[in-house]
């Protein structure tokens, strides 16, 4: 049963004006999701990856958790599991999607990117595209998005080792792109734990990234550029490295995850910050903070409405009996 939840919005910026509470309304679309990670939608049906190894298929009031059959056992480490997930552009015909997951092999953990195919309400691993991306318990990255060029973009974390981010022989701490021949090339370097990708309507690529003890970042990503970690972070500058357009600063932590553009603003899911941040990328200001739902993992816009999922069951939140939840903002 859907229930209306009233939201409070906090306005940030130069004016420091308070806006009226209860101005926005969020509606529960689906409850009891199992550590959801990435929101997709096709023909009004939601497909949401869950870290435990399932895809939550939400069709109206019906929620089905469909099993994902993988070639190796999912890792149960702190931030690991079935993470990034994006439907292929031809999903309606092929029923295929890309996925990013963590697995254990001979006492070590790795990430890989694969193609999944949906058949008889199960998802089968069909092809491995990148394998044995080294990782540890943390900093997997894991966001998958299809760009305006039709190519797959993948964010990969530094696996907890800052040296990886500046190592051109490692995919860790990078954003990579799948080329037409199926190979992957490094698109940008110098990242710590990038978890959000979104394109502005003008084609500009934006990225959200976890900083080290605050200093979370929103970056404009350009091919071949170096974003500086661990040499610079936050508002620091140095020749040859790119400084973010927006940062949380050294005294606040957002832990940003999924991002999307909605009606001209950048919406940012915030885990540690327990909010959906609404940002103006032209001014560099955080204009609103939508709070009261706990940890937020991903955001999604269908052009008309904004949706987000909580992550209160991930071991770091305070879950209610309905968590985790897919919400719709009105």
Regions found by a protein language model. Name each.
Residues 16-154, 204-207, 254-286, 304-315, ...:
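Acidic, Gly/Ser/Thr-rich repeat motifs that build Ca2+-stabilized beta-propeller blades
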Residues 19, 75, 80-82, 92, ...:
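Beta-propeller domain segments
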Residues 1-7:
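Sec-dependent signal peptide recognition
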Residues 7-8, 123:
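Intrinsically disordered, low-complexity segments enriched in polar/charged small residues
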Residues 11-13:
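C-terminal motif of bacterial Sec signal peptides marking the signal peptidase cleavage site
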Residues 31, 136, 189-190, 291:
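Short, glycine/acidic-rich beta->alpha junctions
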Residues 142-143, 297-299:
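Short, surface-exposed beta-strand/loop micro-motifs that present aromatic residues
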């Amino acid at each position: 049963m859907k229930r209306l939840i009233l939201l409070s919005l906090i306005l940030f910026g130069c004016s420091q004006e308070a806006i009226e509470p209860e101005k926005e309304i969020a509606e529960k679309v689906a409850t009891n999701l199992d550590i959801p990670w990435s929101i997709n939608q096709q023909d009004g049906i939601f497909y949401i990856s869950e870290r435990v190894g399932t895809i939550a298929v939400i069709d109206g009031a019906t929620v089905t958790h469909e099993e994902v059959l993988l070639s190796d056992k999912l890792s149960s480490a702190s931030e690991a599991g079935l993470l990034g997930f994006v439907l292929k552009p031809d999903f309606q015909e092929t029923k295929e999607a890309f996925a990013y997951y963590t697995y254990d092999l001979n006492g070590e953990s790795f990430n890989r990117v694969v193609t999944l195919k949906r058949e008889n309400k199960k998802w089968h691993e069909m092809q491995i595209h990148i394998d044995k991306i080294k990782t540890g318990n943390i900093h997997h990255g894991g966001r998958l998005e299809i760009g305006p060029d039709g190519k797959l973009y993948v964010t990969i974390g530094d696996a907890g080792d800052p040296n990886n981010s500046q190592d051109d022989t490692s995919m860790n701490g990078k954003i990579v792109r799948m080329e037409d021949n199926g190979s992957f090339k490094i698109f940008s370097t110098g990242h710590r734990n990038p978890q959000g990708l979104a394109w502005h309507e003008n084609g500009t690529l934006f990225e959200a990234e976890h900083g080290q003890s605050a200093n979370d970042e929103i970056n404009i990503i350009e091919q071949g550029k170096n974003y500086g970690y661990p040499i610079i972070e936050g508002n620091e500058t140095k020749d040859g490295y790119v400084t973010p357009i927006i940062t949380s600063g050294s005294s606040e932590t957002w832990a940003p995850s999924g991002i999307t553009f909605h009606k001209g603003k950048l919406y940012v899911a915030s885990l540690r910050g327990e909010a959906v941040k609404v940002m103006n990328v032209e001014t560099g200001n955080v204009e609103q903070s939508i709070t009261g739902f706990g940890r937020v993992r991903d955001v999604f816009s269908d052009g008309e409405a904004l949706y987000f999922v909580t992550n209160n069951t991930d071991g770091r939140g305070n879950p209610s009996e309905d968590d985790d939840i897919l919400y719709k903002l009105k």
